[in-house]
């Protein structure tokens, strides 16, 4: 088996991140609570209660309940739990989480006030890392060879271009028979993965809201998202050959995704009973339309040894010698650079909340997001964009609708002091038996990236907060614990016919935030 086969597959991997469900799910799935410390302390369940800058995202109508000018600033820190079977604790301190302002203008007649607002806040934190080992007979290199054979069977020659057969980088073997599974690996030899990701998803939001008769509130928010994800994966496996020599195979993948998105949110809140503070809220959030840019750099390092059917060695390194090949460096704008677009699903939220006297408030919220409705598009050479139907099929197969339940409360033992608590339950967007097969259809053959994927559990978020008010000034603190598990697969073992062996990953995260604000 030629070593070049691995290089050709690695070259293919560079051509599109848009086919990578691991990163795409990271972008479109923002199942967390960020914002002011009051909002976080109540678990984000303030869509019907309103009167906080962070409801600009959950229910735009809630800002209509603010009758004075307001400004707030939030900063914080977060740290990871025991982040895998072997654990890699890490923290991010000095985070800037939120800043916003409301300008309130008095109305006349039934229009009590009209407000213009701006708010910046974090939507997702991508700072994460984990390391793990599995002991299995499955081989990443073996899987890659199986994919190479699949590519040849379906494509004939790479991209259907005969000249690629003579290109050193794309030198696929002449017949698919040369891609038979050949890697025999002892389960006692480890497979190791180190994954490190950095970055965040941030939102800049502009809001118009109105208060009608102190019973009806309406609002609209225009949101602009900024995406910055940097992820590095280092995979290493080894086997002991029949002569007792250790043969290594290493794969390093560096990925960068940047870009912007746009969305709209429409909200309404009503007090159905004039004499009661009880409120009902409803929000519709359009998809976020992302324009993204992707850069990928991959390398393969191996001492594996293969023969062809005739027994002739295609590649035979000297003892102790490694062969490393970087497919293309980052300066190449054709192979390692891609522009694409993602459309996230529609979201709807139903909310309720109320106050009891002047010292207690509660809120409940339900959100539905149809993640199978997400889609990917590419710029077309004829102008406009083209929907990737193959990836849409993958999305329908892998993802399922997400349901989110939020609950929160605030208690004031005295008028100046508040104690808050909240809870979120968020269902997973993937099924436990989901897997990633980058060669499931002809179109997708030209767009694989890495072979790794992660199946996620449901998410639980518990929050606690404290607040202090004095005249025009307020200060709030919040603590958040986000609990989620994952099963990470460096590859699917379909072509190896070996039982899967995932790395258990603990995605738990702790965070604290502090907010300072003024109303005048």
Predicted segment positions?
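Positively charged n-region of N-terminal signal peptides that target proteins for export
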Residues: 1-4
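Glycine/Thr-rich phosphate-binding loops that ligate phosphate moieties of nucleotide
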Residues: 7
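Hydrophobic h-region of N-terminal signal peptides that target proteins for export
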Residues: 10-17
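Outer-membrane beta-barrel porins/channels
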Residues: 19-34, 40, 102-520
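Outer-membrane beta-barrel translocator/receptor signature
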Residues: 37, 49-58, 63-137, 199-202
């Amino acid at each position: 088996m030629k070593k070049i086969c691995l290089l050709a597959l690695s070259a293919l991997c560079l051509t599109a991140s848009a086919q990578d469900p691991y990163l795409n799910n990271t972008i479109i799935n923002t199942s967390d609570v960020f914002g002011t410390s009051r909002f976080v302390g109540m678990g984000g369940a303030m869509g019907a209660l309103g009167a906080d800058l962070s409801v600009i995202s959950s229910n735009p109508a809630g800002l209509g309940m603010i009758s004075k000018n307001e400004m707030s600033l939030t900063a914080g820190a977060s740290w990871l739990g025991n982040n895998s079977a072997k654990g890699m604790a890490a923290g991010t301190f000095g985070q800037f989480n939120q800043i916003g302002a409301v300008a309130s203008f008095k109305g006349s007649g039934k229009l009590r006030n009209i407000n213009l607002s701006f708010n910046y806040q974090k939507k997702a934190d991508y700072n994460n890392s984990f390391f793990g080992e599995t002991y299995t007979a499955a081989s990443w290199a073996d899987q890659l060879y199986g994919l190479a054979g699949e590519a040849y069977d379906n494509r004939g020659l790479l991209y259907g271009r005969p000249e690629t057969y003579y290109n050193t980088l794309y030198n696929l073997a002449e017949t698919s028979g040369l891609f038979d599974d050949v890697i025999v690996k002892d389960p006692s030899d480890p497979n190791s993965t180190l994954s490190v990701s950095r970055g965040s998803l941030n939102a800049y939001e502009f809001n118009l809201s109105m208060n009608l008769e102190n019973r009806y509130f309406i609002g609209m928010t225009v949101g602009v998202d900024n995406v910055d994800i940097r992820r590095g994966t280092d995979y290493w496996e080894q086997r002991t050959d029949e002569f007792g020599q250790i043969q290594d195979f290493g794969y390093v993948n560096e990925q960068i995704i940047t870009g912007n998105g746009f969305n709209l949110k429409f909200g309404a809140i009503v007090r159905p009973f004039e004499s009661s503070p009880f409120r009902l809220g409803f929000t519709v959030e359009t998809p976020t339309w992302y324009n993204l840019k992707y850069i990928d750099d991959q390398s393969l390092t191996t001492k594996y040894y293969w023969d062809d059917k005739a027994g002739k060695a295609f590649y035979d390194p000297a003892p102790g010698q490694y062969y490393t090949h970087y497919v293309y460096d980052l300066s190449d704008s054709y192979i390692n650079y891609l522009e694409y677009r993602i459309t996230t699903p529609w979201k709807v939220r139903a909310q309720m909340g109320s106050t009891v006297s002047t010292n207690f408030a509660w809120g409940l919220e339900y959100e539905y997001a149809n993640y199978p409705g997400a889609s990917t598009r590419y710029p077309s050479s004829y102008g406009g964009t083209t929907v990737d139907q193959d990836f849409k099929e993958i999305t329908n197969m892998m993802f399922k609708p997400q349901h989110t339940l939020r609950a929160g409360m605030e208690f004031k033992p005295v008028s100046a002091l508040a104690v808050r608590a909240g809870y979120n339950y968020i269902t997973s967007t993937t099924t436990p038996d989901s897997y990633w097969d980058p060669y499931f259809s002809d179109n997708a053959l030209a767009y694989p990236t890495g072979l790794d994927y992660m199946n996620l559990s449901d998410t639980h978020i518990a929050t606690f907060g404290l607040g202090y008010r004095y005249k025009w000034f307020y200060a709030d603190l919040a603590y958040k614990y986000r609990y989620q598990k994952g099963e990470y697969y460096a590859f699917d073992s379909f072509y190896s016919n070996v039982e899967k062996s995932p790395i258990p990953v603990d995605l738990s995260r702790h965070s604290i935030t502090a907010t300072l604000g003024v109303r005048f």
